[in-house]
Amino acid sequence: MSTFQESRRERHQRLKQRRRRKWTAALAMGAAALLFSAGILLHAMDGPRQDQGEQAAAAPYGAPPTLGKARGNGAMGPLPPVYGPTAGANAAADGPIRLVFAGDALMDWSVKETIRKQGPDYPFAHVAEEIQEADFAVVNLETAVTFHNQKDTNQLFNFKSDPISLEGLKNAGFDLVSIANNHTLDFKQKGFLDTLANLEHYELPFMGGGKNGEEAYRAHEVTIKGKRIKFLAFSRFIPQTYWFAADDRPGIAEAYNKSSVLPVIRKESQDCDYLFVYMHWGVEKNNKPEPWQRTYAREMIDAGADGIVGSHVHVLQGFEWYNGKPIAYSIGNFLFPNYVKGKNADTGLLTLTIEDDGIRMSFSPYQIYRDQIIKKDAAYVKRQFKYLESISYDVAIGADRAIEAIQSKPPASGKH
């Protein structure tokens, strides 16, 4: 007897179509209600009709319809329903588990305008298929998601994205976002709480931040193909200490103090099969990690992490293996406005594949171009692999995109 099994990509397409039908139905019902109300109002009016000289500004593409009053947390509602997580939708009872990680996603500036014109799926049109082929996918949300306007004036740049941009991340195939970075509080606690509310609305789980310290340092756990897998996120680049999550304060999980990180890893790793850490760290534009980062990564693995993935520096950095565990020091920008050029525009998807005999690491190069993540030709991919090998630590990248550990070369004779 044959058994039909819906793939993760097919499920994403089906849910996206269902969301669109819900939006259309909700807007149609709203329009009908407005017409009905307008008819009653016109019947009831005794005085002259109001002059229509004032025109309301057109709402940006995807702005949530005002079908109700704004909630106290700043998110608009009620909104059309969004359907739930897709993790493991194509998972059999056994077999390899493919985890995909992407770098910093910023849907402000030119990306915001492009989404308003082209829709939230446009930036991910060329990369979504690979994301959806994974069993679980993670991205760093490098922006507040809010309509709140009061900036944190201590920031050089303040980023905020429209809530509809989260639909693009969801439709692309992401199952989890890290909010542990130096931009999710760009519009203060109000904007941060809006961000959490909007993520909850789009049913995009988050890690690395929260309404209090307990939530910020909590691991996100999923079960895929019978394996319990946890994810943690921390930031070691936070503009102000008042961004740190505390018992009674919303904020970010900080990594300046190892005592904030290593005990959490030890605790969370006790009752799961695998634990992965997403770190926001490093010196911007540097193509290699600082020595302290290499030490820190090893300490996190010694504490119980099964892999470390980094972001923040806006460029790709190299890879390393430590005790059979993968380290990717920076996977770069993932989606950034169209001012990014050269190495700032080089991006890709990191895949960690869990197999019976260990974890495999591979990387698929892409490029940011005019507010999209695009595929490149074989020559570009070959150049990227050669470059990434040159800045990595004792790895070789094969034609199959696998990143393998190689034995260090012994020192030359007579030198120590």
Show which residues each predicted segment covers:
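Acidic, metal/ion-coordinating pockets
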Residues: 2-16, 21-416
